[in-house]
Amino acid sequence: MTKSELIERIVTHQGLLSSKDVELAIKTMLEQMSQCLATGDRIEIRGFGSFSLHYRAPRVGRNPKTGQSVSLEGKFVPHFKPGKELRDRVNEDEHEEAHT
């Protein structure tokens, strides 16, 4: 699902909200989450999951075209850990689809 598809679904299910309002709300939420992670903070949405940063240590990689060794710097990458309710729902829905 893309961001525009998400906006469309929310507008369809919430008839009182305009497309512009939903788009602004989603853009604002994503911007706030990005800023939070950029400053090293953790985000927890109960029942859904948590977002945090994981550190990838410096390492030696390979250029796939030449096979030459390349030194890669350490970096932080965003990580999502689904909450129990989300995991249960995904497995429940997957289980139902497998039997239909």
Curated annotation (Swiss-Prot):
SUPFAM superfamilies: IHF-like DNA-binding proteins. Heterodimer of an alpha and a beta chain. This protein is one of the two subunits of integration host factor, a specific DNA-binding protein that functions in genetic recombination as well as in transcriptional and translational control. PROSITE patterns: HISTONE_LIKE (PS00045). The keyword Transmembrane helix does not apply. GO terms for molecular function: DNA binding; structural constituent of chromatin. This is Integration host factor subunit beta.
